From Swiss-Prot:
This is Meiotically up-regulated gene 4 protein. It is found in: Membrane. One of its GO terms (biological process) is meiotic cell cycle. Has a role in meiosis. Residues 132-145 have a biased composition (Low complexity). The lineage of its organism: Eukaryota, Fungi, Dikarya, Ascomycota, Taphrinomycotina.
Length: 845
């Protein structure tokens, strides 16, 4: 297949921009010895006459980092050809006007508005910028390997050029063309095209050679290529007999969608297959010539295409490694404010023989492919910038660390990381240790140095002396897939080890989260302990039934086979399915008792995740005026606060319940709820939260039945409708969640300051002493109501706060435990079976 030609498949280049007759670009590149590629960009621009203020972006400045070494602009006008030459390494500006007549004068035809960004060494200001600007600036005069390619006649600078000062070019009102930076592009603006017939621009730029750690290939980014030009691309490479070192066009697939990658591959394949080569025997350089890219080819840039030239250098990695590497990461929690931990990374490298290493591109292998005696053995790793800058990080005396790529390289798609190459001197069998340390706050990410080569034989992550409880989160990696918990030999540590020892493709990060708790146990912990790290309760209403899913994450030091917890079956439900650590093999881990209760058994690993699903079918009971759904929120007999996430997947259901008064210190505020009195320090643990039908503005009187000098504020109609439709009332007596459905009780004035709302219990159940706990919780709302009234009078803006996220996390208060079995019998006797069919209920009434 031959590459598509612009004449057969695409319009002429002039149609890409109606303001120009022709836009063409010749881009020729070559490699140097220090991970730098050199490009010469030759632009030919022919504008359309009788137009003014035409802007043309011709060089994209970001996100690719490069250095502009020189710029030459040649203007063809009615007054004759004129040339401007700007060169970085000599800090010199040269100009010639009307070359044919030998006349030299100030270049008033050319104006530059971006000297500070392009050539800071030529800037008229005394103060230099502290940080590099959009374009990466680095001096090339001291580096002989970064010298520009052989100059053409266009690049040659006459000896008698007029040496102009920078201010001569800046903001000239009489200029015909102007050079600017606009929206991260180098832009050429034609102020008047009546006298300009043609413009030639030659740019010399240096671009770093980067490395893709997904394909382990080196590449030269081509994001700087402009979009409206017909581009002819060529590149010089050292002649090689190995097909693996051939150049080919590719793209940054890490930021491309899978569906789009296929279409891009179909476009690039003809260009790679139809590439032509020419060999220069004198220099042993082979030049690759790709077919011209039409202007429409750059349309892929808008779809996140990152065009690159890839090549595979020979012996990029050692073929046979005789080194072993072990990595031990420890996180020690510190008693600081805010809470933080010290993360230390200990790397132990043992080299048995350095002569078995093949070399990296910076060195030259001998005839037998082994290292020379003066070569150094190396391994590569990705280092976070915070570690490099940390004063507590150090490396052994027999090692030095160097950057194989520029510090601002995009190899890992993040400026937070740097690719490091660690070199060791030639030694016999020996071991060396690397230690890096950093302080991170709890809940923030800690970045572990990623070892690209050699693959670690042992990778362990340990949290020492955690508070009770403490959780570990590893993003972008399934912990059951790549990392597994380690059997605890100590009672005051949580350990994980990496399942495989292959090279990691992405920088490894983890989060250490301190879960909220009421009481910190003394350390070290007891020999046997169990805690629920997290619990997720999801209610999914369906057609005539409910699906209730409960997910529990346990951390336990119990022996495998030990009973962890008994979970009561939800009322009128059947167990649908169960999973242990994501697998349906639950034999010996989930036991269903004859009374349909569930017993969870300790698995082989200290961290276990149990997923349970029940299906509840609707039943009916005419004697009661509301129905109750009892759901399981298990809790252990410990003074530990278990975080429970409640997720009700419906837009017609509303929540009313508890929120922890100290929730700002422990977790985010309950979301999708209007939180009342969240800042009141002297309010009890019971805080009312509900979701109104419509957003209520700040200061609206929404507190119901407030006693104020014999005056009562009634609840808004939206709040009444909310209660009549659906309520979720959370009471953590026995850690049980009650859903109250279709409440039909009246709204009356508070009687004797003893009730917040009229008791919703049927008269036949009022004498049931076993329900006093639930009724007492309802009556406690009146006390909260009074506290809220005080705050409403003083600080109304502190009482009402609206948040708008779709999930909620409720932290239960620790109360006296009651018997699950007793509650089950009492509620069955009081309310009968579950009734959820509203339509039938309305007809019955």
């Amino acid at each position: 297949m031959t590459p598509p030609s612009s004449s057969s498949h695409f319009p002429s280049p002039s149609s890409a921009n109606n303001d120009f007759h022709s836009l063409s670009l010749e881009a020729h590149g070559s490699l140097s010895d220090k991970f730098i590629s050199q490009f010469r960009l030759n632009y030919t621009i022919i504008p359309i006459a009788q137009k003014s203020n035409i802007s043309l972006p011709f060089l994209t400045l970001s996100p690719c980092s490069f250095t502009i070494c020189s710029l030459r602009a040649r203007l063809h006008s009615l007054h004759g050809p004129s040339t401007v030459f700007l060169k970085r390494e000599t800090s010199q500006i040269s100009a010639r006007v009307n070359d044919e007549n030998g006349f030299t004068a100030s270049p008033s035809f050319f104006s530059v508005d971006c000297f500070d960004e392009l050539f800071p060494t030529l800037s008229t200001t005394d103060e230099q910028p502290k940080e590099p600007s959009i374009i990466s600036i680095s001096s090339s005069s001291s580096d002989p390997s970064s010298s520009p390619p052989p100059s053409s006649s266009l690049l040659k600078t006459p000896d008698n050029d007029f040496c102009a000062r920078p201010e001569t070019f800046v903001k000239s009102d009489t200029a015909d063309i102007k050079l600017q930076i606009h929206q991260n592009n180098l832009v050429l603006t034609f102020l008047d095209t009546t006298t300009v017939s043609k413009v030639n621009i030659v740019l010399e730029i240096h671009i770093p050679v980067l490395r893709d750690f997904v394909t382990f290939e080196q590449y030269i980014p081509l994001m700087f290529l402009p979009s409206p030009f017909e581009t002819i691309l060529s590149f010089d490479n050292l002649k090689s007999d190995s097909p693996s070192s051939d150049l080919h066009l590719g793209w940054d697939h890490t930021v491309s969608k899978e569906s789009m990658s296929q279409s891009i591959a179909e476009v690039l394949n003809p260009y790679n297959k139809g590439v032509s080569r020419s060999l220069n025997d004198a220099t042993n350089m082979e030049t690759y010539h790709w077919s011209p890219f039409p202007p429409q080819f750059s349309t892929f840039n808008d779809n996140a295409l990152r065009l690159r030239i890839y090549y595979k250098p020979k012996s990029w990695l050692p073929k046979n490694s005789s080194c072993s590497l072990s990595v031990d990461v420890k996180a020690t929690l510190l008693e600081t404010t805010p809470p933080s931990c010290e993360v230390s990374y200990n790397l132990l490298l043992t080299c048995r023989s350095s002569n078995r290493f093949r070399l990296f591109p910076a060195s030259t292998p001998n005839s037998n492919g082994l290292c020379r005696n003066d070569s150094k053995c190396r391994f590569l790793m990705i280092l976070p910038e915070t570690i490099i800058k940390s004063p507590s990080s150090f490396i052994g005396d027999s090692y030095n660390i160097a950057n194989i790529d520029p510090p601002s390289s995009m190899n890992v798609q993040s400026s937070e990381f740097r690719v490091g190459e660690v070199q060791s001197f030639t030694t016999n069998t020996s071991s060396f240790a690397f230690t890096f340390k950093e302080i991170v706050q709890l809940g923030s990410k800690a970045s572990v140095p990623m070892i690209l080569f050699p693959a670690p034989s042992n990778y362990k992550l340990t949290i020492e002396k955690p508070p009770f409880p403490c959780d570990l989160t590893i993003p972008h990696t399934a912990i059951n897939d790549s990392w597994l918990p380690m059997k605890l030999k100590e009672t005051n540590a949580i350990s994980y080890y990496r399942k495989t020892c292959s090279s990691c493709k992405y920088p490894f990060q983890f989060f250490i989260n301190k879960l909220p708790f009421y009481q910190s146990p003394s350390l070290p912990l007891s020999a046997t302990y169990v805690w629920i790290a997290s619990a997720l309760l999801s209610v999914q209403p369906g057609n005539g039934s409910f699906n209730i899913m409960l997910s529990l994450k346990f951390v336990s030091s119990m022996k495998p086979g030990t009973e962890l917890l008994t979970i009561k079956q939800p009322k009128s439900s059947l167990l649908n399915w169960g999973l242990v650590n994501g697998y349906p093999k639950t034999e010996g881990r989930i036991v269903l008792l004859p009374r349909n209760d569930i017993v969870l058994i300790q698995a082989d690993q200290p961290t276990s995740v149990f997923d349970l699903c029940w299906t509840i079918k609707p039943t009916y009971e005419k004697s009661s005026n509301f129905s109750c759904l009892q759901l399981p929120i298990p809790v252990l007999n410990t003074p530990i606060l278990t975080p429970v996430t409640i997720n009700i997947q419906s837009t017609t259901y509303y929540l009313i319940g508890y929120a922890n008064q100290n929730s700002k210190k422990t977790l985010d505020q309950p979301t999708s709820l209007l939180v009342l009195g969240c800042k009141a320090k002297n309010v009890s643990e019971l805080i009312l939260s509900y979701l109104p039908e419509k957003p209520i503005p700040d200061g609206a009187p929404i507190v119901t039945n407030v006693v104020e000098t014999n005056k009562t504020n009634e609840a808004p109609s939206s709040f009444r409708k909310c209660l009549q439709q659906f309520l979720v009332f959370l009471t953590f007596t026995g850690m049980t969640l009650f859903i109250l459905y279709q409440l039909t009780f009246p709204y009356g004035v508070a009687k004797d300051n003893s009730s917040f709302i009229d008791t919703p219990l049927p008269h036949s159940c009022e004498m049931e002493k076993s329900l006093n706990v639930l009724q007492h919780k309802v009556l406690q709302l009146q006390a909260v109501n009074m506290k809220l009234h005080d705050y409403y009078e003083k600080e109304p803006t502190e009482i009402y706060k609206t948040v708008s996220v779709t999930s909620t996390q409720i932290m239960p208060a620790v109360t006296k435990m009651s018997s699950f079995e007793l509650e089950r019998e009492q509620f069955h006797k009081a309310f009968g079976f579950l009734r959820l069919n509203r339509k039938k209920d309305d007809n019955a009434n």
